[in-house]
């Protein structure tokens, strides 16, 4: 029988407050129970019980369905990463290799064939129970014998081969439909032809100065790579070994990006083959161009905004940070950061005081992928990344020349006080000379270079054009503020301060890997 429950006019929650804090969990629980009581007042208890069971059943089914989807996704991902044991039976290795690539496999008179329609075909010739030859075909292209793949299987590197094949297939995302994939592949062929014509030679300086960098064309099991930046310091280090052009040992060290294509909500224009060899965007596809960076690239917030202007969607961000603080390692910055150069001998040192405000913003980031609307805009990305690399490297040069090794002998050195302010628009260095207060301003130039301007800090008047030209040339040759400033000022021009070094009793930056430039500098 229905139970008569009087309607409740109001809810009064009495909570004993301890330690002057409100127990929100108890309040939430009491409110939920009151909702149950009010719902029970409208139903007999039998109907109420049925409603509760029905509600719980719906939730359980929903949770189970979501759980099943997650499990299926996890299993699918695990299949792509399952290790292939070298000592497993041949049929087992073939099966795992095929399933992890989403392919079918069939036995042939000569061995095995692994196939994924329109994407991959692998023919394995078996002799005496071992793989004798590997013939590959990607995206319905002409088949070719792959010596690299054959050597890998002779060494038992089945898992490594699977990963390399998966990387090749990732150029065209599996979610692209057939027509869009064909359009993207045609665009990639046009790009490859253009880069073959416009490619720089393998000299480090040519790679740095060419609008399109240097394109290392695709190999059997490696995507094409576009190298876009070779810093002056790297060139100097390699020149000590009489190396001035790109070598195989440079391939995984120098920064590069790879091209791939991913689905997009919007339709974008793509180039197609033209009998006159012209770049004309006559094709279209619901796809975007992905530039996958070889490693995370540190960029400032203004630079990320520039990339956004030509992007189909937001860049892939690994983490947010402050780009200047990011490079200092674990040095604790409570106030203005103070550093002193480690010039050899009796040289006058530079004592830098970097304004603390330079390290407070958290809008900078480390990015790993850039998505373009138009394929031809990749050269704009090259220009943006080169300028950003130069800006970051200029700040890193201060860290490198001020790096204090553990166990330095305590001593007193003469130093020039310099005050530094860091921002993406301009780096300023201020110091007092016997003649006037000086401000050195460093900005991006028109081309991929920095521009230096030296002015009177009080009046803003330029010191001399020839000084600007000299310092601009030195900075672009070295990407180093300390080296550049040695041409701007000497101990005879300034009132020197006697500084006790090292500045820190211990160097926390040695506890973690130091920036690449510092490592190279130490060698």
UniProtKB/Swiss-Prot annotation:
Q: Which GO terms describe its cellular component?
A: nucleus
Family assignment?
Belongs to the Mediator complex subunit 1 family.
Under what name is this protein listed? Mediator of RNA polymerase II transcription subunit 1.2
Oligomer and partners: Component of the Mediator complex.
Q: Organism, per UniProt? A: Caenorhabditis briggsae
| Compartment(s) of residence | Nucleus
Q: Does the keyword Transcription apply?
A: yes
Listed as disulfide-bonded, the cysteine pairs are none
**What the protein does?**
Component of the Mediator complex, a coactivator involved in the regulated transcription of nearly all RNA polymerase II-dependent genes. Mediator functions as a bridge to convey information from gene-specific regulatory proteins to the basal RNA polymerase II transcription machinery. Mediator is recruited to promoters by direct interactions with regulatory proteins and serves as a scaffold for the assembly of a functional preinitiation complex with RNA polymerase II and the general transcription factors.
Q: What is its main location?
A: nucleus
Which keywords belong to this entry? Activator, Nucleus, Transcription, Transcription regulation
Top-level taxonomy = Eukaryota, Metazoa, Ecdysozoa, Nematoda, Chromadorea
The membrane spanning regions, by residue number, are none
């Amino acid at each position: 029988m229905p139970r008569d429950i009087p309607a409740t006019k109001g809810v009064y929650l009495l909570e004993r407050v301890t330690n002057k804090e409100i127990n929100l969990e108890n309040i939430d629980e009491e409110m939920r129970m009151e909702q149950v009581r009010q719902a029970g007042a409208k139903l007999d208890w039998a109907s109420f019980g049925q409603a509760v069971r029905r509600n719980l059943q719906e939730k359980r089914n929903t949770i189970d369905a979501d759980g099943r989807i997650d499990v299926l996704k996890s299993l699918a991902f695990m299949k792509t990463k399952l290790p292939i044991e070298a000592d497993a039976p041949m049929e087992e290795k073939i099966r795992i290799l095929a399933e992890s690539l989403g392919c079918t496999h069939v036995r042939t008179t000569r061995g095995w064939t692994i196939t994924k329609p329109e994407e991959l075909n692998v023919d394995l010739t078996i002799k005496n129970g071992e793989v004798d030859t590997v013939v590959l075909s990607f995206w319905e292209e002409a088949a070719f014998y792959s010596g690299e793949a054959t050597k890998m299987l002779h060494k038992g590197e089945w898992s490594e081969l699977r990963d390399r094949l998966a990387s090749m297939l990732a150029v065209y995302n599996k979610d692209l439909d057939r027509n869009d994939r064909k359009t993207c592949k045609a665009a990639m062929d046009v790009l490859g032809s253009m880069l073959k014509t416009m490619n720089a030679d393998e000299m480090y300086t040519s790679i740095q100065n060419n609008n399109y960098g240097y394109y290392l064309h695709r190999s059997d099991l490696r995507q094409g790579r576009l190298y876009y930046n070779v810093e002056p310091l790297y060139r100097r280090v390699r020149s000590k070994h009489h190396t001035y052009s790109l070598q195989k040992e440079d391939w995984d060290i120098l920064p590069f990006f790879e091209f791939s294509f991913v689905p997009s909500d919007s339709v974008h224009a793509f180039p197609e083959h033209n009998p006159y060899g012209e770049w004309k965007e006559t094709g279209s596809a619901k796809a975007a161009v992905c530039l996958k960076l070889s490693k995370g690239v540190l960029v400032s917030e203004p630079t990320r905004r520039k990339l956004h202007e030509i992007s189909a969607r937001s860049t892939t961000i690994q983490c947010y940070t402050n780009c200047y603080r990011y490079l200092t390692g674990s040095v604790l910055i409570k106030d203005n950061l103070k550093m002193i150069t480690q010039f050899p001998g009796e040289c006058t040192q530079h004592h830098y005081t970097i304004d603390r405000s330079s390290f407070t913003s958290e809008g900078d980031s480390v990015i790993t992928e850039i998505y373009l609307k138009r394929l031809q805009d990749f050269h704009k990305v090259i220009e943006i990344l080169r300028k950003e690399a130069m800006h970051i490297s200029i700040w890193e040069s201060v860290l490198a020349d001020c790096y204090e090794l553990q166990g330095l002998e305590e001593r007193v050195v003469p130093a020039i006080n310099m005050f530094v302010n860091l921002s993406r628009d301009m780096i300023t260095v201020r110091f007092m000379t016997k003649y006037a207060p000086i401000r050195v301003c460093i900005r991006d130039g028109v081309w991929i270079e920095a521009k230096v301007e030296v002015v009177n800090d009080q009046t803003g008047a330029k010191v001399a054009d020839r000084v600007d030209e000299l310092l601009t040339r030195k900075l672009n040759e070295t990407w180093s503020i300390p080296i550049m400033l040695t041409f701007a000022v000497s101990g005879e021009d300034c009132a020197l301060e006697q500084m006790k070094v090292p500045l820190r009793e211990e160097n926390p930056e040695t506890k973690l890997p130091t920036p690449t430039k510092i490592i190279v500098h130490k060698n």
